[in-house]
A protein has these predicted regions:
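Non-catalytic structural scaffold of enzyme domains
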Residues: 1-126
Length: 126
């Protein structure tokens, strides 16, 4: 078992809301959270600046020997994810956008199927 911590980072403290859910699923995991409250918000900054911040934070987390980095910031996920994966190939790096999009699409597909089944049954029984 890999006992190294999981690194989380966000441009502020919003990513902290993900931690309780993760701890319920993986109660023995150690977590290092970096909230960049000194430089928030990221959304209004140049992409080059955001990439610099993201690289600095990832460097810090890697120096703490994390086994994975979770980017809990939409701005960084959308502008820096691939760059960080290339820069840190030995660390698994995941963003927040893909998992959220998959969860939404799964729920929408399930809802569509339920609605379809409901109307199909209603129409069939008329």
């Amino acid at each position: 078992m890999d006992n190294r911590p999981i690194g989380f980072f966000d441009s502020g403290l919003g990513g902290l809301t993900s931690i309780p859910h993760l701890k319920r699923l993986l109660p023995k995991e150690k977590i290092i959270y970096f909230g960049d409250t000194a430089r928030t918000p990221y959304g209004s900054k140049a992409v080059s600046t955001i990439r610099t911040f993201a690289t600095q934070i990832a460097d810090f987390l890697v120096s703490k020997d994390v086994k994975m980095i979770v980017i809990a910031c939409n701005t960084v996920s959308s502008t820096c994810l691939e760059m960080l994966r290339e820069k840190f190939p030995d660390v698994s790096i995941v963003g927040i956008i893909d998992p959220a999009a998959k969860a939404v699409s799964k729920k929408c597909l399930l809802s569509s199927k339920i609605v379809y089944d409901f109307f199909h049954i209603k129409i069939s029984t008329l």
